[in-house]
A protein has these predicted regions:
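Exported/extracytosolic protein signature
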Residues: 1-172
Length: 172
């Protein structure tokens, strides 16, 4: 009697019995807690895969406040500049290996309409997660923590630049 034997098994979908799909952690940071009009803020978002499996098709989107404006061509993913990407439109950051992370950063300028205001900012990550092999993947949305920057009324900052020069002896 010829019996069929399984010689190779291939897994196409990553799934888990974690029903809420919380395998991604998102943390957001801003470089300045206090700023003035026309100052540049750098936002950094760390997306960590906390699972044992590689994740794919992760989409990043940032909801930029009306008090700041994104500076074109400042998006970096893991330190590499990604020209043409816009956090407000969103973009794919690709796969994240198990227990690894991707670091996204970008710059924005503080607008004049922001004096005496608090700039609030957060980001979102979207991905598909399958916890049951018999069902379609579920779209998961994870919002980062909010970061805050207080804006001063000061429009210009004073910079003091000093340099001591020694005059040649023949000029004294």
């Amino acid at each position: 009697m010829d019996a069929m034997r399984i010689t190779k098994t291939t897994f196409n979908d990553v799934f888990s019995n974690d029903a809420n799909g919380s395998i991604i952690k998102v943390e957001k940071y801003v470089d300045k807690k206090c700023a003035s009009v026309f100052e540049i803020l750098t936002y950094t978002i760390i997306v960590t895969n906390t699972s044992r499996y590689k994740t794919g098709n992760i989409f990043f989107k940032d909801y930029i406040s009306k008090y700041i404006e994104f500076i074109n061509n400042t998006v970096k993913v893991n330190g590499i500049i990604k020209r043409g990407l816009d956090p407000q439109q969103g973009f794919y950051i690709g796969r994240i290996d198990a227990s690894c992370k991707k670091i996204i950063s970008f710059k924005s300028v503080v607008l004049p309409n922001s004096a005496h205001r608090i700039i609030k900012n957060s980001a979102n990550i979207y991905y598909y997660y399958k916890c049951n092999l018999d069902k379609f993947p579920t779209r998961i949305s994870i919002e980062s923590n909010r970061v805050y920057t207080n804006v001063n009324k000061i429009v210009f900052k004073q910079l003091n630049i000093s340099n001591t020069l020694k005059a040649p002896k023949n000029l004294r």
